[in-house]
Structures are given as structure tokens and as C-alpha cells.
Amino acid sequence: MSGYYNHVKHQGYSRYGQNSTVRNGQHDGLRYRNPSPAHNGTNEGEGLQGSRYENAGGVTHARRPPPVVKWGEAAFRAKYHYFDVEERKLLHLDEMKHWQNGRLPANGYVLVADAGSKGRPVMRERNPEEQAVDPRGARAAHTVRRVRSLLTALPRIPYDAHWVGPEPPKEVVVFPKQREQALSVQDPIIKNFFGTFGEVAHFESFNDPNNALPLNIYLVRYINVEGNPDSPYKAAYKAVKQFAKQDYLVSGARFAVRLNMNGFLQKTIDKFVTENLQRAAKLRHEQAKQQSTVQKVTNVSAVPSGVPPPKIPLGLERIVNNKPILRVSARFCALHGITSEDFKYGLKNYHWTRVINHYSGIYIIFDDIAEAEKCLQMESLRLTFFSRRRKIPVKIKFMLIEPSHQPPASQPLTDQDEVPKVYETEAELIEETLKHIINELKTTLYKDIRRRLLGPTIFDALNPGNYPDIVARRQKEEEAKKEKEKAMVEKTKKEAPSAAAFDIFNLYGTAYKKRDGTKGKKRHVAEGRPEESSGRRRIQSKGTAPMAHMLNYESLKVNGTASPIKEAESETCSSDEEDDDNFDVEMTDQSSIKKLKRESTATTPEQEPLQERVAGLSAERTKELLSYPEKYRPLAGDQPEPIYPEFLIEKYDDPLLSIVDLQRSVKDKEDMELLKKVIAYDREEVKDVINDIEFFAWRLHRDYKEHKENMQHQSKLSESTYKNLLNAHGGCFKQQGFRKMPDKLKSIYLPHRRKLNQPLNTVYHHGIEDFANTDNNKMDTDPPEDTFTPEQTSSRVNRALQRRFQQDIEAQKAAIGTESELLSLNQLTKRKKPVTFARSAIHNWGLYALEPISAKEMIIEYVGERIRQPVAEMREKRYLKSGIGSSYLFRVDESTVIDATKKGGIARFINHCCDPSCTAKIIKVGGMKRIVIYALRDIAANEELTYDYKFERETDDEERLPCLCGAPNCKGFLN
């Protein structure tokens, strides 16, 4: 074995030694040796002496494969730092230079802190003998930068085709940070907000799988825009980065925004579902515990304790009605100025029934004890209100007053109390059931007999045709009664006072006569006929009343105060007409009564006496004339006079005709017969008969009066007529959902649509007095206060000032000697009038004048982005697709259009009107065409500026746009 090691250590036996020879490109010393003993019995050392490559037996072994150098080509060997693995040296060592050329220190450099330069690092020569010092033990230098709370964020690498690694997240998870209270957040609000970061491809909200309640967890996934693959990832990154240090606040709730990485969405959902299960289990446990407590209280008599439970005040026991309530101390509420309205808004997420503001405190009443305990647990010492006294937020502490579980005191049973009967056997139950059924059958049979047998028999027996003698006698009595009435009427008319008896002083009653009696005596004496006047006064005192009261006697029935004239006239009318008149006058409003009084003051020509009208007529014609009531008798005249004022149902706005309008339209029996024919009335076919017709008619009159008063109040508030199209056809408006309202109806209920010619003053001017709110107690003789009114400069003065300003600018340009954009002046900006925009009565927004503008004066320039005609057509289509319905494109000439949709001034808000107050002119300023708005007429302050759009006529009627300008000469359409 010693010989083997000697051979191995010898230099000539090295794999790449100097003694190894190369044969055919391969080394000769690469053959493995066989260390096994020789076959001829000699030892290993002797076997190796014969040959280095052959063993004693003469057996030849395979050669070891030569090494193959991978980078042995000429291109690699020409490199400057190439190392030859076969020769074990650098091939270009001779060309290299040593770094120790005397200019650099042999031991290198070290960095040390320079004490004279505030710790700045300095490089100096390294000394190996110098002992090293640990810099951590030294005192750190003072720095002024802020302490880092987070590590420096790496820059975001945009996603492209050369991206290496997993795809970055493009989904955002939005979840609430507070789970104590129920959230009422609508999904479109979340979706629309996060849609501002990028185009949303998918939006989803998640619910609890156990109870289907919303978890308020939302997933927003973005989609890439064409040509930009990094857009969805960048949008998600921007959304998360914006809310990294602050929460997303919406509808009073705070949300966190995170990227959906490593299954974050599923983890969040599982966490929320688990919390809901735990909360539900806790509530069930508390409910079971409460039920057990209630059962113990009901079974065991109450034992008085040291501290009495809180009680409800005596005045609230009936209102509370043994329900759970939460109480807040009155002293606390008075100290901080908290009212019941604050609790209604603060506890809007809970199902309370009533909030009572009592002198002892504020009481919140609940129907369910569980809801009251939930509110107590979630809001006590958590609900915060702002103190109106101390100007600080304060927390509210609630006190729960549970309902008493004591059973009500037993009361003796009365005859009205129903005691359930208990049957011992089944036979008794069957017998009692049969009795009940037989009693019901008896009752039904009695009703059927009365309705089918007794009723028709009695009506047939009472038929007037069966008693001709009684009918004839009754007719004779009626004729005698009519003759008596006619005689009474003639007698009364003969004794009736003339129009001269109604003195103007009689309108004021007896009090005025006593006070001014001397004047009346003098007047009668002057006339020279005291006897006649006294007689007339005596007749008036007996049978007449003042004229102001007699105006009402024509329609109103006053028992015991009507004059004989009214009684005689009323007897000639039918009872049906009297009832109609009564109901008609009862519902007459005060305005109609005042109108009637005003009309009564006018003098009317005195009618001819009855004898003169009857004179010259035959007996038959006289009888026929007297058979008609007084108001229906014909009168001689040039033109026929109507008896009743004309009432056209066609002009009635309401589709449902009220009972008052029906009575106004039906005046006599002829109208009643026509009405029966129109509605195909048949007495025998009437099914639903109203028993108390007077009460039903009174209720209809009451409803009509209330409806009319409501309409008057609405017209006073809205300053416009109310349309029935605004009424909800299915109950309330919430039941109908969202619907598009025509622009014509918006002028009824929108404040800015009510006044077309007098728009609302939407701009507040400092220094202008509000004359409506001035002190009314000031006398007219008070000297006027000194007020400053700004002087109104004319357009001519403005142009002169502008020219002077332009000359100053030209002088500055000449002094500088160079053209500059800073010294360019748009003259139109100096000449424009003070205008503003506000809600318009015509359409959306409008342009208003802040001061009076004279005719032919310039108002404002229509500015915007100058584009070509093809670009304008393309933008118009794009605006329509994006939902921008209003067009702000103004044509200058055939090839140029001004687009003020996104870049422009307030002149774009000018609306169309068929009777415009302004016109547009194209002028040149500095060699460039500009659009300028001029006044066609004098315009008042706060008046809306309008302009005729001059659209071309559309051939398709569906494409025409309705015009809402409200001008007298309105064409109806814009195009």
C-alpha cells in the first residue's frame, strides 16, 4: 500500500502533470489502476513495478473519457479574462496590469466619519495595525427627518406582454369596518364610485347564506381598455392606494378597500358569516335566558327588593300600554339641548313605535322586548349627539323599563262575557250543533219569505190603481190646493212693497236708524209724503227684512225667519228642486257669496206687474202662464234671458264629476229625465241601494268642499293650477316606482318652472335692500336713510374706457418691442354684461341678466373649443352615446364649429325661445370670427336671456323636440 501512495504523490502520475504525454489529443495518464492483488501471488508493490498501465496478469482496462471543455471555442478564448482549465492559468495574463502601481495604497481604503463635517463619511488609507472600533457603540448623530412608520413602497411595475410571474390583482374587495349597526347602503352608489377609477367589468354583492341578509361585502373587477393591458391593474391599485390611510365613507358607514389577493374575499366572507352565527347564538341564548327569567317571575310571587325598579309616570301608562321602553333623563336632555327629533333620527335603524317627550324624560316605546334590549346593548353609551349647550359631542345612556308581567286583576264575569261550554259526550255536541243549524235555517227562511212573498204582496195591494175613488178624491184636493196657492200668490204680490220701500239706510239695521233717526225724518219731511213713507216702513217691518239678508233667503232655508214672500214662492216649487238648491248653497264658498253680494248692488229694471202681463191673454193662455213657476215664466224682451248660468261639463278639468257639479248641471225635471236616459236608469235594475241617502249626499258635499279647499291651498302655494295627471293611480307614488315625468307637468310643482316671464332671483346681491322685510312701522313722513346705489354706466362709456385701456396696452407693447401673449387683450371680455346661470323655467339651466340691459347692446361671447365640421359630427354622436343630451355645438361657418360642451363659458346655458330677447352675430376680432350675443330689446334684471336656435325642420315627427318656452307665438317644436 505504501507503493500506491508513493505513485499517487509522484508528479508524473498527476492527471494534468508535466510528465503526462498527449497522444492523439488525449493524455496517456488517464487510465484507472487496478488495486487488486496479482494473479501470480506477488504483492501489490511488485505488480506495479512492471508497468504503470498494466497489471501483472496482462489485462488491459478501458480508458477514462477525456474532458470536454464547453467554452473552449476561439471566440471565448479571445476574451480578456479567459481562464484555461487545462493549463490552469489565464491566457492573457501578460496583457494585464497589477493594481498596485504605487498610486493606490497597498492595504486599501476605509470609510470613517469626519468629526469636523457633522459625521460625513470620509475615505482614508487602511492601517492593519490600527485596532477596529465598533461603530454601534458610538452615539448616533442627530437627524431632523421624521420617524418612518412604514417601509418605502416599491414602485408599481406596469403589466405588459413581457410580464414575468403571476398576474397582478385586478379585483377590489370593499367591506365594512364596523359590524355593530345595520347598514343601508345601496349597491349602485358603491359601483358608480369605484367606476371612476376604471371601467368595471363585474360588480357583485354578497349575502349571508344562513339568513339571506346582506353582508355589505362588494367585489369590483376591472376590465382592460382596448390598447392598454395595464388599465385594470392600475385602476385596482389606485382604488386601494387612495383608501390605504383613510376609510371609504358612504352614508355614514366606513368601509375598507383591499386587493383580492391570496383568497382575501373568501376569507372575509367566512369571517363575517362566522361572526353572524356567533351573534345569533348569543341572541338566542339571551332570549332563552330572558324567557326563563320571565317564567320564574310569573310562577314565583314578587319579593320586594331594596332598590325599586324604574316606573312609568302615571300620565304615560295608558299610552305605553305595558310595552318595553327606553328612558333618557330629562335633566340630561335639558342640559345638552337634546330633543325627541334627535332620537328619531339617531335610532332610525330600530323598530320603535313612538318617541314621547315628557317632563320627566324622553321615552322610546318598542313593541318587542328583544328589539329594546338590542337597542340598549348597541346604542347605550355609544350613540353620540352634539350638545347644543356645551358644543361638544356627548354619549347617551339609556335605561330599560321592562313591561310588568303581573296578570291583570280578575274581574267578575258579566252577561256579555262568553263562557266556553264543555260537552261531556259526543251526543251532546251533535245535538247542540243541530240546534244551531236549525236556528240559522229558520232565520234564513224568515228573511226569504219577507223578501219574496210578503213584500211583493203588500206592494201589489197598495197599488193606486186598485183604489180609483181615493185617487180621484186626492186629485181634487190637490187642484183645490193649487187654486188656493195661486190666489195667495196674487194677493201677496198686490201687497208686496215696491222697490222704493227698500231704502239704502235700511241695509244697516235698527241700530243705524236709532243713531241716525233725525236724518231719516228730515228726508221724509222734505219729500212731503210722511204718511206713505211711514206706511211703507210699517209694511217692511212686518213682512220684510234688510236687503243684505234677503239676498240669502232666496237660497238658504231659515226656520221661523223667512218672510211671507219667500214662503209663498217656495210653495210653488217642487220638493226635489228645494233639496237640490239646499245642497248647492250649502257648499258654496265665501267667494261666491261675496260675488253674489257685489252683483246685488247693481240696480235691475223693475219687472212688470202680473196684471199687465196677463192683460190681453185668453183664459186658457192665462191659466197656462200661471201654471209655470215664477222663474220659468217667459219674459218679453229683445233677446231671451237664461234662467240659470251656463255650465259646460266639457270644460270641466276633473274626469270625475262631483255631486255639486252634477246638481249644477241638472236644473229641472227635463234635465233629470235626460240624465236618466243618458245613464240608462231603471228603477227595477238597481242593485246597490243606499239606505240613508241624505247622509250619503252630505258626505259627498263635505268631500267636495275639502277637495276644493285643498286645491285652493295648493294653487296658492305653487302659484299654478294643479293637474290631475300628477295623481297616483295605484295609491301612493312609491308604489309606482320611477317614471319619466313630461316637461309640461314639471312647471306645476318645480319652483324654478313656475314663473316663465318672472324667473326666480337665484343670486344674492350684497348691499341691495329687501323691501319686503323692511320695517312697516315707519311713517311715510320719516326721512329716507342715506343709501349708496352703484352708478350704472352706459355701453358707450364702457367702450370708451376699453379703447383707452387698449391704447395703454399698445404703448406697453411698443416699449417692450417684442410680441407677448401676456399683453394680448380680448376686447369682448371687457364689453360683456354681468350675467349668471341658474335653474331655468324653460329647460334645465338658463342664463340670467344681473342688471338691466338696453337693446342692441352686447351681452356675452359664446366661447368654446374651435373644431372642424367632421370632428363636430363625430363628437355629436359620441355625446349622444355617452348620455349628454344637451347640444352645445354652435356653427360659425361651413367649416368651423364651436364646441362648448366640455370647454366653454356660461353663454352655453342660453335657452331657446320662439320670442327671443337676444340674437347671435358673428364678428371678427383680430382677424378671427367670434360669436357674440346681442340684446334685441330692453331686458330687465333677473330676466332669462333667450335666443332662437333656428333648427331645420325635421321630416320625421318622432325626431321633433317639443318647445317649452311658453311664448304667445310659440311654434310648439324646436325643429
UniProtKB/Swiss-Prot annotation:
Gene Ontology CC entries for this record: chromosome, telomeric region; Set1C/COMPASS complex
Residues of the SET domain: 833-950
Keyword Ion transport: no
Protein residues bound to S-adenosyl-L-methionine: 949
EC number(s) on file: 2.1.1.354
Biased composition range(s): Basic and acidic residues: 516-535
PANTHER family reported in the protein's UniProt record: HISTONE-LYSINE N-METHYLTRANSFERASE SETD1
Domain remark in the UniProt entry: The RxxxRR motif forms an adapter helix that bridges the nucleosome and ubiquitin.
Name under which the protein is recorded: Histone-lysine N-methyltransferase, H3 lysine-4 specific
Organism: Eremothecium gossypii (strain ATCC 10895 / CBS 109.51 / FGSC 9923 / NRRL Y-1056)
